[in-house]
Curated annotation (Swiss-Prot):
The lineage of its organism: Bacteria, Pseudomonadati, Chlamydiota, Chlamydiia, Chlamydiales. InterPro entries: LpxK, P-loop_NTPase. One of its GO terms (molecular function) is ATP binding. It is an enzyme of class 2 (transferase). This is Tetraacyldisaccharide 4'-kinase.
Length: 367
């Protein structure tokens, strides 16, 4: 007999994979230490043994990356850079691997077009960025060295999304984004923690962008590992898109709203805390692995659970919403609001000016 809800086994599987990805399972005991050591050794081997001389291109290459598994804020940083550099007269292209997208396994260059592509093909983050930038500015290729060789002919600046671990392409400016609440991903490699790279490598960054509230202890911890200039930013909600109702509402529309929240993020707590600060009464959550999309059955299940708890709607990140496709208009589902977020660089004028001046100097030196 068919049911519109997922099986209990599938729900258990979802919860298990989320717990593993957040370092809550497999992280303890000798087995967890062994897995973490293997992960760290593999990372070190790939970097030291498989590295080759990085390829240089005529464009200025700016890398935006992190040292943890997801959830640091790379996408808002890339979008901010693309906007401010365009305002300074530069033509910018974004190079992405298209993680989790079908085209990421193909050795060909894909120009992301929101009118013809979906998240399943190009990946959620490239599709999200392409929808906010000029047409033809976001490119996906499995090998970004090859992509850069082709794209550099037509652009002043190449923004390398998630590029810190890429050693095939020479990078003129290295930016690393860290989460202010947990800058070192629990201080251990996956699965004991969320590290995907050694904190020692932070010293290689030209600038560190600290996303969100960063207490004095975490600031001292960061300074212990690197003395690179730091830019402190605050994530903020700009508006909420209710596609099924055709509405775009401001931040204050969330105050007092009873809603269920689903998201597939590397650090979901940051998003949940932001909604609480905005006045949302969260009546239930449904967490997904990073980059995973919610299924039709899961959406029906979570909508029903939210309605039973007197929820008025469902909220998700814009990145999660872009994977919904036609599910946003699925009959029998509570209204879904896609929360748009951006970084607030207020009071960081000196730090951001130093970053942009460095980019100017490097680019002018290449002419």
């Amino acid at each position: 007999m068919k049911t519109r809800f997922p099986s209990p086994f599938f729900i258990f599987y979802r919860r298990l994979t989320v717990a593993i990805s957040l370092g809550k399972i497999l992280g303890w005991g000798c087995f967890g230490k062994l897995l973490s050591w293997i992960f760290a050794a593999t990372v070190s081997f790939r970097r030291k043994v498989l590295s080759s001389a990085p390829h240089r291109v005529s464009s200025t290459v700016i890398s935006v990356g992190n040292i943890v598994l997801g959830g640091s804020g790379k996408t808002p940083t890339v979008l901010w850079l693309a906007e401010v550099l365009k305002a300074r007269g530069y033509s910018c292209a974004i190079l992405s691997r298209g993680y989790k997208g079908k085209c990421s396994g193909q050795r060909k260059l894909t120009i992301v077009d929101p009118e013809i592509h979906d998240a399943a093909y190009v990946g959620d983050e490239p599709l999200l960025m392409a929808g906010k930038l000029s047409k033809g500015a976001v490119f996906v290729h499995k090998d970004r060295r090859l992509a850069a060789k082709e794209v550099a002919k037509n652009f002043d600046i190449l923004l390398l999304d998630d590029g810190f671990q890429n050693n095939k392409l020479h990078k003129d400016v290295e930016i690393v984004v860290v989460n202010g609440q947990d800058p070192l991903g629990g201080g251990a490699f996956f699965p004991r923690g969320r590290l995907r790279d050694s904190p020692k490598r932070l010293q290689e960054a030209d600038f560190i962008i600290v996303n969100g509230s960063c207490g004095l202890e975490n600031q001292k911890l960061l300074h212990t590992w690197c003395t690179s200039p730091k830019i402190f930013v605050e994530p903020r909600i700009s508006q909420v898109l209710w596609d099924s109702r055709g509405e775009k509402l401001p931040l204050d529309s969330l105050s007092g709203l009873a809603a269920g929240v689903f998201c597939g993020l590397g650090f979901p707590q940051g998003f949940l805390d932001m909604l609480k600060r905005a006045g949302v009464k969260i009546v239930g959550t449904y967490l997904l692995p990073d980059h995973a999309g919610i299924t039709k059955k899961e959406l029906h299940y979570f909508s029903s659970m939210t309605a039973m708890r007197q929820g008025e709607g469902i909220l998700c990140t814009e990145k999660d919403g872009i994977k919904l496709g036609n599910l946003i208009h699925e009959p029998g589902i509570l209204p879904i609001g896609k929360v748009q977020m951006e970084f607030d660089f207020t009071h960081q004028e000196d730090a951001t000016a130093a970053l942009l001046d460095k980019i100017d100097r490097i680019h002018n030196g290449k002419r």
